[in-house]
């Protein structure tokens, strides 16, 4: 019998949910944060059709379902669906009883206060957890990279944020958040593929475009140069087979979609690119800490997985920074899951054990305790 019950670490992303046990080096379960509902009436008796499907099952039956993501831009917008996802995580993916394990959840920085309270309430009241903690995603990514100082560029499916951290303290006045991330790039790719004559419109077809994006897109080091290369030869063209067997060819769309990270104006957004956002965030910090931030720019999240993104980032930041400044981009290979890995490290530290909000504290103070205990 183990004397210590492992905590559960759940990183609820806008696109994928990563879940597992504290102390593990990778999440046990990674599945899409999707809830699907049938678009048609079930007519076969005894098929055991459900009124909703979660995760991979929703993904595989997507042809007959309407897919909804309960988390948009890192903020939970549909709590009933969110509860379904958590239920699925505990009972189907991890196969644990949530009332027996402390639970660590993650959230985006600058999240609405109500959001954390509601999360706390559901964990304690619906799932009866013995203890709970909520941690900021970017901070966990820094833990995972083994640093206490650095500036984290965390870009997932729903939200991108830049969080400077010095000696373990996040500098809240310099945190920037951009509501542009993987999902917007998928939508943009859908749009530019339509210009080529390939239309994708349903929620299921959007998932196909996401797959094209993940398999074929990359970031150009020099965008103008790349556009020229693409127009002169077909060396950059790649083909992709759709589920029905039709083969499509994509060329400059491969790097035009992720270019939106550096030029959000193509999406009609006013914010600066990720390089400008990172630079501005560093400039909001004290002059004494900037050198350490320039030298520790840590990438995390699935949207930083494009080939070529580190080199481009290095080039762009170097151009903005003072000429003598040493700029270093750290892009760990496991950065897709670095938030989860950081959570796993945090929840297994002996010094962390007094940080949990216990069920008893919750019963005494209610959901608002989360603002006092988790920061």
From Swiss-Prot:
Any one GO molecular function term: hydrolase activity
This enzyme's EC code(s): 3.6.4.-
Originating organism: Penicillium chrysogenum
Name of the featured protein: Actin, gamma
Location within or outside the cell: Cytoplasm, Cytoskeleton
Purpose: Actins are highly conserved proteins that are involved in various types of cell motility and are ubiquitously expressed in all eukaryotic cells.
InterPro entries recorded: Actin, Actin/actin-like_CS, Actin_CS, ATPase_NBD
Domain of life: Eukaryota
Keywords from the UniProt entry: ATP-binding, Cytoplasm, Cytoskeleton, Hydrolase, Nucleotide-binding
Reaction catalyzed: ATP + H2O = ADP + phosphate + H(+)
SUPFAM superfamilies in UniProt: Actin-like ATPase domain (SSF53067)
Cellular component, GO, one term: cytoplasm
Protein family: Belongs to the actin family.
């Amino acid at each position: 019998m183990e004397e210590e019950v492992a905590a559960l670490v759940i990183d609820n992303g806008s696109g994928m949910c990563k879940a597992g046990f504290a102390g593990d080096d990778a999440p046990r379960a990674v599945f899409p944060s999707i809830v699907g509902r049938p678009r048609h009436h079930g007519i076969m008796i005894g098929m055991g059709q459900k009124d909703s499907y979660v995760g991979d099952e929703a993904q595989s039956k997507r042809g007959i379902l309407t897919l909804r993501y309960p988390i948009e831009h890192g903020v939970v917008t549909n709590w009933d669906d969110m509860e379904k996802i958590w239920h699925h995580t505990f009972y189907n993916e991890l196969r644990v009883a949530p009332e027996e394990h402390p639970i660590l959840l993650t959230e985006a920085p600058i999240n609405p206060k109500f959001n954390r309270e509601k999360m706390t309430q559901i964990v304690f009241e619906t799932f009866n957890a013995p203890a709970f903690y909520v941690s900021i995603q970017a901070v966990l990514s820094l833990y995972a990279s083994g640093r206490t100082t650095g500036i984290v560029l965390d870009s997932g499916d729903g939200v991108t944020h830049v969080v400077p951290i010095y000696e373990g303290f996040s500098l809240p006045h310099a945190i920037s958040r951009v509501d542009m991330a993987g999902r917007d790039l998928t939508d943009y790719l859908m749009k530019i593929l339509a210009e080529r004559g390939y239309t994708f419109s349903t929620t299921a077809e959007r998932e196909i475009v996401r797959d094209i994006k993940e398999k074929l897109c990359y970031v150009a080091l020099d965008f103008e140069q790349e556009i020229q290369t693409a127009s002169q030869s077909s060396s950059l063209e790649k083909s992709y087979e759709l589920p029905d067997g039709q083969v499509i060819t994509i060329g400059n769309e491969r790097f035009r979609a992720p270019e939106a990270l550096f030029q959000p104006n193509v999406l009609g957004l006013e914010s600066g690119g990720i390089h400008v956002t990172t630079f501005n965030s560093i400039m909001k910090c004290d002059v004494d800490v900037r050198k350490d931030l320039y030298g520790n720019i840590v990438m995390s999240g699935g949207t930083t997985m494009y080939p070529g993104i580190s080199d481009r980032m290095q080039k762009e930041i170097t151009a903005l920074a003072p000429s003598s400044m040493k700029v270093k981009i750290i892009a760990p290979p496991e950065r897709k899951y670095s938030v989860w890995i950081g959570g796993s490290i945090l929840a297994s530290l002996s010094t962390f054990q007094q940080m949990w909000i216990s069920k008893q504290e919750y019963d005494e103070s209610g959901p608002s305790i989360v603002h006092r205990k988790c920061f």
